[in-house]
Design a protein with these regions (language model features):
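N-terminal localization/anchoring segments of enzymes in phospholipid and broader phosphate metabolism
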Residues: 1-355, 359, 363, 387, ...
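Glycine- and other small-residue-rich loops at beta-strand/loop junctions that grip anionic moieties
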Residues: 177, 373-374, 408
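Thr-Gly-centered strand-to-loop micro-motif
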Residues: 371-372, 399, 429, 448-449
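Helical hairpin unit composed of two closely spaced alpha helices linked by a short loop
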Residues: 374-395, 400, 405
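Short glycine/threonine-rich loop-to-helix capping motif typified by GTGT followed
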Residues: 383, 409-413
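Surface segments flanking catalytic/ligand-binding clefts of nucleic-acid enzymes
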Residues: 425
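Catalytic-core elements of nucleic-acid end-processing and repair enzymes
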Residues: 437
Length: 517
C-alpha cells in the first residue's frame, strides 16, 4: 500500500497532473473563446491553417510532418498547443547561444588528424565518407588503434567497470540518464567516495526527468556530502515548457582520460539483472581506451560547463603527448581499426544519430544486424531498411519480447507488416527486454551507443555513441547478434494478421501520435 501511495504522490505524477491541468485549462480557454466569438473561431481556424502550412515547409521528417499537420487541422484545440509544447525540436534561442559558446570553446581542443582520415580513406573510401561526415557535423575526429571491448550484458561489464573506477588517480566523470540507489549505484558511490578521499576529482551528472522517479529528494546533497560534485540537466518543473522535451539521454563514464564507457546502460539494478524488470534485461556497453577517450571527456565537460556556467581548464584534461604514447602502447595487438565517438544534439538541427544509422544501412552489402528497444521510425528509415533487404542484404532487427511501454510497443509492432513483406527479418527477444542500441554490418563497421530508433532519440535528445571500423568490437557485436537471434523468435506476417481488426486499426491510429511518444 505504501509503495502504491508513493507512486501516486511521486514528483512525476504530481508534476504531470499539474502540467495536464495547465494544458487542459489552456485548451478550455481556447474552446470558450471560439464558442462565444465567431470572429475568434474564424481567426483560430485561420491560425491552424497557417501553422499547418508552416509545418509543411519545415525541414523535418515527412512522417512526423504528416502527423502534426493532421493533429493541427483535425483537432486544432489539441493540436496547436501540443505542437507548441512537443513539436519544436530545438531549445530556446538563448539556451542555444549559451551552449554554442561552450561548444566552440571546447571543440578547439578536438582538432582532426588529417593523417588518420587519409589512412581510412585509402583503406575504404566509403568508410572515410562516414568519418568525414561525423568530423564535420558531430565535431569529433576519427582515431586509429583504440582498444575496444564490447559487453553483451550489464553483468558482464559491471566487474570491469568497478575495477576501472578503483584505478582512478586524477578524475572520474559520470553522465547518465537514469540512476537509482541499489546494489549497482551503491557500490559505485562507495568507490567514488573513497576516490574523493584520495584526492580524485569526481563528478556526477544526471538528467532531471530521467531520475525524477529513481533518485530520492536531495540525493545530490547526499553525494555532495561525500565530496562528489553533482549537476542536474534541466531539472523537472511542472510548467508547460518546450525545454522539458530535450533530455540528456547520454551514458558516459570517463576515468583519467584513459578509459571511457558508453552504450545503453544506466546506473540501476535492472541493467545488471540484480532486479527483474520485464524478464531478462539485455543491454550493451563498450569500453574504450586510447586517444579517442578525449572525445568523451570533452562531451562531458561541454554539458557540465553549460549547466554550472563555468569554464573548465581543458588543457588540464587533455592528455600530453607522452601520455598519448603510453596509451598507444597498451592497445590490444589485433586493434588496427578506426574509432570515432560522436554526439547528437537538438541544437544544430543535424540528425547525426539517424544519419550514422542511415549511412551504415546504405553501405551494407552482405548483412545488417540491429538491436533496438523501440521501432518508431519515419519513411526515410523504413525505405532505407527495405531497399537494403531488396538489394540482397540480410537485414535483421531484434526488438523486445516483453515491452516496457505498452503504447510504444504497439507503435513498434505497427511497423512490422511493411518491413516483413519487403524482406526485413524481425525478431522479438524471448527472454525479456532488449535495451541495447547497436548496428553491425559486414564484419566491417558497427556502432554502439544511446540512440534509440524513435522520434525522441533521433530528434529531441542529447545522445552519444561510437562508430567503429574493423575493430575487434565489430566482430564481438556480430557474435552477440548471432547468439541473440538463437534466443529470439522470428515474427511472421501470419502472426500479425491474426491480430484482431480493432488492434490493427488502433496500431494504425497510433502512428498519428508518434511524435508525442
Amino acid at each position: 500500500m505504501k509503495r502504491i501511495l508513493n507512486k501516486l504522490f511521486s514528483k512525476l505524477v504530481l508534476g504531470g497532473l499539474i502540467i495536464i491541468l495547465q494544458f487542459s485549462w489552456f485548451v478550455y480557454l481556447l474552446y470558450s473563446a471560439t464558442v462565444y466569438s465567431s470572429m475568434v473561431d474564424a481567426l483560430f481556424k485561420i491560425a491552424s491553417i497557417v501553422l499547418a502550412l508552416f509545418v509543411s515547409s519545415r525541414d523535418m521528417r515527412s512522417t512526423y510532418k504528416t502527423s502534426w499537420i493532421f493533429l493541427i487541422l483535425a483537432l486544432p484545440l489539441f493540436g496547436i498547443p501540443a505542437y507548441y509544447l512537443f513539436g519544436r525540436p530545438g531549445l530556446t534561442k538563448r539556451t542555444r547561444m549559451k551552449m554554442d559558446v561552450v561548444s566552440s570553446r571546447i571543440r578547439a581542443y578536438s582538432s582532426p588528424s588529417d593523417d588518420v582520415m587519409s589512412a581510412l580513406r585509402a583503406e575504404d573510401d566509403s568508410a572515410g565518407q562516414q568519418a568525414q561526415y561525423l568530423a564535420r557535423y558531430a565535431g569529433y575526429p576519427v582515431y586509429r588503434e583504440a582498444d575496444t571491448q564490447y559487453y553483451c550484458c550489464g553483468e558482464e561489464m559491471y566487474p570491469q567497470f568497478l575495477e576501472d573506477l578503483k584505478t582512478a588517480k586524477s578524475y572520474i566523470f559520470l553522465e547518465y540518464f537514469i540512476a537509482e540507489p541499489g546494489k549497482m549505484l551503491d557500490a559505485i558511490v562507495e568507490i567514488l567516495a573513497q576516490k574523493v578521499k584520495e584526492g580524485v576529482d569526481v563528478r556526477f551528472m544526471y538528467d532531471g526527468i530521467g531520475c525524477i522517479q529513481t533518485l530520492p529528494n536531495k540525493y545530490y546533497c547526499y553525494l555532495q556530502e561525500k565530496g562528489i560534485k553533482c549537476a542536474c540537466f534541466q531539472p523537472f518543473r511542472p510548467l508547460m515548457s518546450i525545454i522539458q522535451n530535450n533530455r540528456d539521454h547520454r551514458k558516459i563514464t570517463v576515468i583519467d582520460g584513459k578509459v571511457a564507457y558508453t552504450g545503453g546502460m544506466n546506473l540501476a539494478d535492472e541493467y545488471i539483472n540484480a532486479r527483474v524488470r520485464f524478464g531478462y534485461w539485455k543491454d550493451a556497453a563498450i569500453r574504450l581506451t586510447g586517444e579517442c577517450v578525449w572525445s568523451f571527456t570533452s562531451m562531458f565537460l561541454e554539458l557540465w560547463d553549460y549547466i554550472l556556467k563555468i569554464e573548465s581548464d581543458y588543457t588540464f584534461y587533455r592528455a600530453t603527448s607522452m601520455e598519448k604514447h603510453r596509451l598507444q602502447e597498451k592497445i590490444h595487438a589485433d586493434e588496427k581499426g578506426f574509432v570515432q565517438p560522436y554526439t547528437d544534439s537538438p541544437l544544430d538541427h543535424e540528425d547525426v544519430g539517424e544519419n550514422v544509422y542511415l549511412n551504415i544501412i546504405s553501405r551494407a552489402k552482405k548483412y545488417l544486424y540491429i538491436f533496438t528497444p523501440y521501432l518508431i521510425i519515419g519513411s526515410e528509415m523504413r525505405t532505407a531498411l527495405v531497399n537494403a533487404a531488396k538489394s540482397g542484404v540480410d537485414v535483421r532487427l531484434v526488438v523486445p519480447g516483453i515491452p516496457d511501454k505498452k503504447l510504444v510497443y504497439f507503435l513498434t509492432q505497427s511497423n512490422f507488416p511493411y518491413l516483413i513483406k519487403n524482406g526485413v527479418k524481425i525478431y522479438t527477444y524471448t527472454p525479456g527486454f532488449i535495451h541495447a542500441k547497436c548496428f553491425v554490418s559486414d564484419d566491417v563497421q558497427a556502432t554502439v551507443g544511446t540512440v534509440n530508433m524513435d522520434y525522441r532519440s533521433l530528434c529531441l535528445h542529447f545522445e552519444c555513441g561510437v562508430w567503429m571500423y574493423r575493430t575487434r568490437a565489430v566482430l564481438q557485436v556480430k557474435e552477440d547478434a548471432l547468439k541473440t537471434f538463437a534466443e529470439s523468435h522470428e515474427v511472421t506476417l501470419e502472426e500479425f494478421q491474426k491480430k484482431s481488426f480493432l488492434v490493427r486499426t488502433f496500431m494504425g491510429a497510433l502512428k498519428l501520435f508518434a511524435p508525442l511518444l
